[in-house]
Amino acid sequence: MKQPKRLGVLTQSRAYNHAPAQEREAAKRLGGRTTPASGSLREKGDVRVSGILRLECKATSKKSFSVTRDMVRKITEAGELSGELPAIEIEFLPLAGQFHGRVAVVPAYVLNQLVTGEK
């Protein structure tokens, strides 16, 4: 993306720069693989554990992160079409004095399946 010189150098956020490493790490940890073009082509999601899980990875260095209906809809549709459980993993990047770690957002039916063991 080209921008006028008066605006200075275009820089990306820490979270944007961290995304490829986050996706690779999640794929390795979960025994899956990263999807081509980070899910922007025909295969949605960032990480796929075939037949089990479809994962969208997000990261932030801010205090909070908003999960939108559209994010949930896209990963849920992709998971349901392939018979996989949909999930969004949010990584809170290190920030002085702030929580650092990962959380997962899943539809309620996924949580029910995890607790009851039902399919």
Name what the model sees in each region.
Residues 1-119:
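Catalytic phosphate/metal-binding cores of nucleic-acid and nucleotide-processing enzymes, i.e., regions
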